[in-house]
Regions:
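N-terminal, polar/charged subdomain of small-to-medium soluble alpha/beta proteins
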Residues: 1-109, 116, 124-128, 132-163
């Protein structure tokens, strides 16, 4: 695969993963296509959407900010760690992580994580851990704007297993 800039945002593809960050809407079909491998029978997909209300406040939108190169490097680390932990003895695990930057409105997808593994248990476990670690480690800041004003909010990672 190749490394380079997409029309919008940055994309890094390196054999076993597909990573993207940009301001255009996330293409869920493209995320799923990155996992096409008939030898892998378990596929797990997580879509994170902006919600409203949040903490009792109506949300107009979230403004996501981040540094593309640093985000992609962190995504690559997450994908490599997942492959090591859940890819079995042959490392057979495909990972796609896409995150949107800029203005994202309620109902729109801000993050997609998908994992394909030989079996469903590994795919589901790896997907869950990548989502939680992405929320914790990606250098992305989000400004929530709504009827209560604007405030920076932290990613709500759930305490649990770490890669």
């Amino acid at each position: 695969m190749t490394q380079g800039l997409d029309v919008d945002g940055a994309r890094l593809e390196r054999g076993r993963y597909d990573l993207w960050v940009g301001t255009e809407p996330i293409d869920v079909a493209r995320v799923a296509a990155a996992l096409e491998d008939e030898s892998l029978g378990g596929v797990a997909l997580f879509l994170g959407r902006v919600r409203s209300p949040n903490d009792g406040q109506v949300v107009s939108h979230l403004d996501y900010e981040g540094y593309d190169a640093m985000i992609l490097a962190t995504m690559a680390s997450l994908a490599d760690e997942a492959r090591t932990a859940y890819g079995g003895t042959d490392g057979r695990l495909l990972v796609a992580i896409h995150h949107r930057l800029g203005r994202v409105r309620p109902g729109e997808v801000s993050m997609a994580v998908a994992v394909a593994a030989a079996h469903r248990a590994a795919a589901l476990a790896a997907c869950a851990v990548v989502v939680e670690e992405a929320k914790r480690r990606l250098p992305i800041w989000k400004l929530e704007v709504g009827d209560g004003g604007a405030r920076y909010v932290a990613g709500a990672a759930v305490a649990g297993e770490v890669l």
